[in-house]
Design a protein with these regions (language model features):
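Core catalytic alpha/beta fold that binds nucleotide/phospho-ligands
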Residues: 1-198
């Protein structure tokens, strides 16, 4: 894999890099973050909280970073003035995706999936999973918080919008989502919440 790509979504810079399966993402993320912040990788002030979420606070209070790896790729995000989460998912057949959705998703999302034929159902399942995981990574609890505690739905233009979320996550209207194909067969999502709204 030789993919090198970068994007800018609002206040967030993102980079996609090749990544060796089975290796931790943090060393490579530190390299990218250090370059972007103008410091040596070992001086990037990443600290993990009790749940394992990496933070740049308190040293860089207006910055946030996150990363995700899937397959042979690593996605790294660096934001200013936001709390962010990223997710990268390699799309692969999920024969029991409705079982997974029934177990983890919000009832409104399950209803959306049930109404679809298999191909669009799988596409929407991965979009929902990726969006939800990115938001929960931004929040700092990960999947253990509960995927059912937030609900996305496609807007008329097809973009996913957060319809509802547990009040602990803040106001649904303040969350922003960007989703895209980061690489062949790899779906990416970025969720961010303005620090000024916390």
């Amino acid at each position: 894999v030789t993919a090198h790509a970068s994007w800018q979504h609002g206040p967030v810079q993102l980079w996609l890099r090749p990544h060796r399966h089975g290796e931790r993402g943090e060393p490579q993320a530190r390299q990218l973050l250090g370059r972007a912040l103008g410091m040596d990788p070992e001086n990037v002030p990443l600290q993990r909280d009790a749940r394992g979420r990496p933070w740049l606070r308190p040293a860089l209070p207006n910055r946030d970073a996150g990363w995700s790896h899937s397959g042979e790729y690593l996605l790294v995000g660096l934001g200013e003035g936001v709390r962010l989460g990223v997710d990268l998912e390699r799309i692969r057949p999920r024969p029991r995706l409705l079982e997974i959705a029934h177990r983890f998703f919000h009832p409104d999302e399950i209803a959306l999936l049930i109404a679809l034929e298999p191909a669009p159902q799988q596409a929407l399942f991965f979009r929902l999973w990726c969006a939800k995981e990115a938001l929960l990574k931004a929040y700092g609890h990960g999947l253990s918080f509960g995927l059912h505690r937030l609900a996305y739905a496609p807007a008329p233009d097809g973009a996913l919008q957060l319809q509802w979320c547990d009040p602990e996550l803040g106001l649904a209207a303040h969350w922003q989502l960007h989703e895209w194909w980061a690489a062949p067969e790899c779906r990416a999502a970025l969720a961010f919440y303005p620090l000024a709204a916390e």
